[in-house]
């Protein structure tokens, strides 16, 4: 799945401690996307780095805007991801 787009998505709001990362991982895996999701140290943001076909990446972004039931998403920022890392699946990172 080397073709497609790579983006970095920052989701802000009540998105930590509400199952947001698991929600994103589950949907990204179902969509066949690669990358990762992690909490950011500010306590109110989650970073998603995702790679795959544009239509599937856009579907994940739509899902991120909604989030799981306990989440309250205030904003979603999307930018191109310029990293060189090759992803072999979609994971939750704890760094």
From Swiss-Prot:
Q: Which family does it belong to?
A: Belongs to the acylphosphatase family.
Q: Which residues form the Acylphosphatase-like domain?
A: 6-94
Q: Which UniProt keywords apply?
A: Hydrolase
* Top-level EC class as recorded in UniProt: hydrolase
Question: What gene is it encoded by?
Answer: acyP
Carries keyword Hydrolase? yes
So where's the catalytic machinery, residue-wise? 21, 39
- Which species is this record about? Caldivirga maquilingensis (strain ATCC 700844 / DSM 13496 / JCM 10307 / IC-167)
- Asked if the keyword Disulfide bond belongs to this entry, the reply reads no
Identification of the protein by name: Acylphosphatase
List the molecular function annotations (GO) for this entry: acylphosphatase activity
Q: Which domain of life is it from?
A: Archaea
Q: Which reaction does it catalyse?
A: an acyl phosphate + H2O = a carboxylate + phosphate + H(+)
Give EC number(s), comma-separated: 3.6.1.7
**Stored Pfam families:** Acylphosphatase
């Amino acid at each position: 799945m080397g073709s497609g787009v790579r983006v970095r998505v920052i989701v802000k709001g009540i998105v930590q401690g509400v199952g947001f990362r698991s929600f994103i991982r589950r949907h990204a895996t179902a969509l066949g996307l690669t990358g990762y999701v992690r909490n950011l140290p500010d306590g109110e943001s989650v970073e998603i780095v995702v790679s795959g076909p544009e239509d599937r990446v856009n579907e994940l972004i739509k899902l991120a805007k909604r989030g799981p039931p306990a989440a309250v998403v205030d904003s979603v920022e999307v930018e191109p991801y310029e990293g060189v890392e090759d992803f072999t699946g979609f994971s939750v990172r704890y760094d």
